[in-house]
From Swiss-Prot:
UniProt-listed CDD domains: ZnMc_adamalysin_II_like
GO CC terms of this entry: apical part of cell; cell surface; plasma membrane
Originating organism: Rattus norvegicus (Rat)
GO annotation terms (biological process): epididymis development; epithelial cell morphogenesis; positive regulation of flagellated sperm motility; positive regulation of sperm capacitation; proteolysis
Residue span of region Disordered: 762-789
The organism's taxonomic lineage, starting at the top: Eukaryota, Metazoa, Chordata, Craniata, Vertebrata
SUPFAM superfamilies linked to this entry: Blood coagulation inhibitor (disintegrin), Metalloproteases ('zincins'), catalytic domain
Record's protein name: Disintegrin and metalloproteinase domain-containing protein 7
First-listed, main subcellular location of the protein, grouped into a coarse class: membrane
PROSITE patterns: ADAM_MEPRO (PS50215), DISINTEGRIN_1 (PS00427), DISINTEGRIN_2 (PS50214)
Alphabetical list of PANTHER family matching this protein: ADAM A DISINTEGRIN AND METALLOPROTEASE DOMAIN, DISINTEGRIN AND METALLOPROTEINASE DOMAIN-CONTAINING PROTEIN 7
Signal peptide: 1-25
Gene: Adam7
Subcellular location: Membrane
Keywords: Disulfide bond, Glycoprotein, Membrane, Signal, Transmembrane, Transmembrane helix
């Protein structure tokens, strides 16, 4: 027993020394105990799943740490990998090999500590428990003990008050306003509400040769290491309602693809050029991080472009990977990603307790983002509108997996504020995902203090004259869908027409491009659009600049005057024109943008170019044609706003947009009306002829009333009439019937049935067989006469 204890102690000491874990003040040997957990949602998933999973969806572990027992509640990180996840490496011949492994199962989890309100965890269960967890401000690292068959683990306690050396700093490239870059993709039209929803960052990770060499054995060691880092980053960014998902990784196993030097700024410039010109052509992502294991003689541990997310050239960063602790490297990745999202360091006056906040300096894993960082991030979203983080890259089955605590209101739930430990909503019962007694709502623009606002309360004021104010319904906590004035509605005193909820004008576009009071230049400038070069054209077809036609001149390149140099990545051009006759000098300033999916230098679509005319893709066309109002009106019902066409604001009556369509529609209508009238006329003629025949029959029949017959009873809707008439045994059965129906009240409008009450018998009491034959006669003619009577 004694030798075994000595051996175990020596193993623990060697593990601590070999790992070189930074910032810990103590460790403790623990034996995590797995608790049974099989709930209804687990049973449902087992029945629905065709492929059994090695790793469970939900786990409970009990850990006795000191005098306290902690219950670790873990949920599998469903948003961990993107649908198009890929792995790239290089063989001995430096040939690139790319795989797309179908990862159906993994061992990475996130969670919290039960009964601890402020807690979090990022754990892998691949071979024992390995990762990070915290309780309030205290943070821990847990790892399995090497060579132990008893399930022994070491829990290291991070020292919150540990000194922070300068070698744990980072650097962000500083840009002046002049060089701040905004890609056109960022400013594409998105509703403001989109930026309040959940965001998604598709992260790509590149590991240099040094990182590969230190983690090449066992074969999947580097993969699990990078996955652990991304899982930690994802846990951190959930506080900002952001999911960080790994879309792929590339391993420079045969040598670095760029020059990595001690100057991190130079390394970042090399890396940004490589990822834009090489990596972007074969892989889509929102941000890429280079993990460098090269011992760089610099105090900086990472570098990033501030506010660079979604920019083709600058959405990248470099992070040093020299320490064995995955959580510390993951924390640095989260820090650099924060710079890319517009966050600055938590320096004075934005302070944060040591080691607590992601954007502060520190050598141990952080806990959360400071209020300053959150404010800076929200301001970045408002100003820059990074569009790439709005699309959801996760597999559909990941998004649809229902359970109480996933922060999504699934079927059968009234609310879902996340795990019990994370829920801060006073309206929702986090244990059952139902509203607390007496409450009617949880959140929304029409929900206040857990109660719905009254009907008619404005929940979304009109942002401008092309917008429409929305009001609460009184029965829904959500504000109705954001609606706007119909495209083409006059605005700004007739200077423009509404388009997609805005009133685009050239003055506003100039102010956006060049700021500083820039406005539209003289109309003579637009003659430059006939040149057909980069600074004067209407269409760009495969880098061939098509000059404008006369009618489209004011829909090509926009020309401005005043303002400053453009803040966008591109080339400015100013023409100085002189008009000798009018003795005026004109400045015509325009620009050509780089790295853009659409050219902001062209006059915006929807801008007025004449009475009833607007610009559309470099052409000046009729407003009705541009907005396709015919389709709009056909989809709308009276004054309703069509849900499928947010651009349509419907008016009373049909909207005919083109004479050709109107004529076609009118022709069809006339043909239908004429055809109906012809059918009605023919029908009336036939009825008149039959009516005259019935009159003649009654005249013939009036001379033969001496014969007595059976009693007929005719049923009508409102009254009964009984009379005795003979039923002839010859070919004239209709005469009597017609005469009988002659006395039908004028209110009678439809034929009814006639029943026979009795039949005549001969003196012997035997019914006349001929009468039975008459009973079976066809009464169609009677019905015809009845209709005419």
């Amino acid at each position: 027993m004694f030798p075994t204890g000595i051996f175990l102690m020596s193993v623990l000491i060697s593990q601590m020394q070999g790992r070189g874990i930074v910032g810990v003040e103590g460790q403790e040997l623990v034996h995590p105990k797995k608790l049974s957990l099989l709930q209804k949602r687990d049973l449902e998933r087992i029945h629905d799943s065709d492929t059994p999973e090695e790793y469970e969806e939900e786990l409970l572990y009990e850990i006795k740490l000191g005098r306290k027992t902690l219950t670790l509640h873990l949920l599998k990180a469903r948003e961990f990998l993107a649908l198009n996840y890929s792995e790239t490496y290089y063989n001995i011949k430096r040939e690139m090999v790319t795989r797309h492994p179908q990862i159906l199962d993994h061992c990475f989890y996130q969670g919290s500590i039960i009964h601890e309100f402020d807690s979090a965890a990022s754990i892998s269960t691949c071979n024992g428990l390995r990762g990070f967890f915290r309780v309030n401000d205290q943070r821990y690292l847990i790892e399995p003990v090497k060579y132990s068959d008893e399930g022994d683990h070491l829990v290291f306690k991070y020292n919150v008050k540990a000194p922070y050396a300068t070698n744990y700093s980072c650097e962000g490239l500083n840009f002046t306003k002049k060089s701040t870059l905004i890609d056109a993709k960022i400013i594409e039209e998105h509703k403001v509400e989109d930026y309040h929803k959940e965001k998604f960052i598709e992260l790509f990770v590149v590991a240099d040769e040094f990182v590969y060499r230190r983690n090449s054995k066992p074969q999947n060691k580097l993969r699990k290491r990078i996955w652990g880092m991304v899982n930690f980053v994802n846990m951190i960014y959930k506080a900002l309602n952001i999911r960080v998902t790994l879309t792929g990784m590339e391993i420079w196993s045969a040598g670095d693809e760029i020059e990595i030097v001690s100057n991190l700024e130079s390394t970042l410039l090399h890396f940004s050029t490589w990822q834009e010109t090489v990596l972007k052509k074969r892989k889509d992502f929102d941000h890429v991080i280079l993990l460098s294991g090269k011992w760089l003689y610099t105090s900086m541990q990472g570098i990033a472009y501030p506010g660079g997310i979604c920019q083709t050239l600058r959405s990248c960063s470099v992070v040093k990977d020299l320490l064995p602790d995955v959580n510390i490297i993951g924390n640095r990745m989260a820090h650099q990603l924060g710079h890319s999202l517009g966050m600055r360091h938590d320096d004075f006056p934005c302070t944060c307790p040591l080691g607590k906040c992601v954007m502060g300096a520190g050598s141990i894993p952080a806990i959360k983002f400071s209020k300053c960082s959150q404010t800076q991030y929200q301001q970045f979203l408002k100003n820059q509108k990074p569009a790439c983080i709005l699309n959801n890259p996760l597999p559909e089955e990941f998004n649809d997996y229902p359970f109480c605590g996933n922060k999504k209101v699934d079927e059968g739930e009234e609310c879902d504020c996340g795990p019990v430990q994370e829920c801060t909503n006073p309206c929702c019962d986090a244990h059952k995902c139902v509203l607390k007694p007496g409450f009617t709502c949880v959140e929304g623009e029409c929900c206040e203090s857990c109660q719905m606002k009254k009907e008619g309360v404005i929940c979304r004021p009109a942002k401008n004259e092309c917008d429409i104010s929305e009001v609460c319904t009184g029965y829904s906590p959500e504000c109705p869908k954001d609606e706007s004035q119909a495209n083409g509605f006059p605005c700004k005193n007739g200077e423009g027409y509404c388009f997609m909820g805005l009133c685009p004008t050239r003055d506003d576009q100039c102010a956006e491009l060049f700021s500083g009071g820039a406005e539209e230049s003289h109309s003579l400038c637009y003659r430059m659009n006939q040149k057909g070069n980069r600074f004067g054209y209407c269409k760009n077809k495969d880098n061939t600049f098509v000059p404008c036609e006369e009618k489209d001149l004011k829909c090509g390149k926009i020309y401005c005057t005043g303002g400053r140099r453009s803040a966008h990545l591109g080339e400015d051009k100013t023409y100085n024109l002189k008009n000798v006759k009018q003795n005026i000098s004109i400045k015509c300033k325009t620009m050509f943008l780089y790295h853009n999916s659409r050219d902001m230098g062209l006059v915006n679509s929807g801008t007025k170019c004449g009475e009833g005319m607007v610009c559309s893709n470099g052409e000046c066309i009729e407003m009705e044609k541009a907005y396709n109002s015919t389709i709009c009106s056909s989809l709308c019902d009276e004054n309703d706003v069509d849900d499928n066409e947010p651009d349509c604001q419907c008016e009373e009556g049909p909207i005919i947009t083109e004479w050709g369509e109107a004529l076609n529609l009118t022709s069809v209508s006339i043909m239908v009306v004429v055809l109906v009238m012809v059918i009605i006329g023919v029908g009336l003629v036939i009825l008149l002829i039959r009516y005259q025949k019935c009159i003649k029959m009654k005249q013939v029949q009036s001379s033969s009333r001496e014969i007595r017959g059976i009693e007929n009873k005719v049923y009508f809707p409102d009254e009964h009439q009984t009379r005795s008439e003979p039923i002839f045994t010859d070919i004239y059965p209709l005469h009597n019937t017609a005469e009988s129906l002659e006395r039908v009240p004028s209110t009678f409008s439809s034929p009814h049935y006639i029943t026979l009450k009795s039949v005549s018998k001969d003196p012997r009491g035997i019914a006349d067989p001929k009468q039975n034959d008459n009973m079976n006669l066809n009464l169609d003619s009677q019905s015809d006469c009845t209709r005419l009577g």
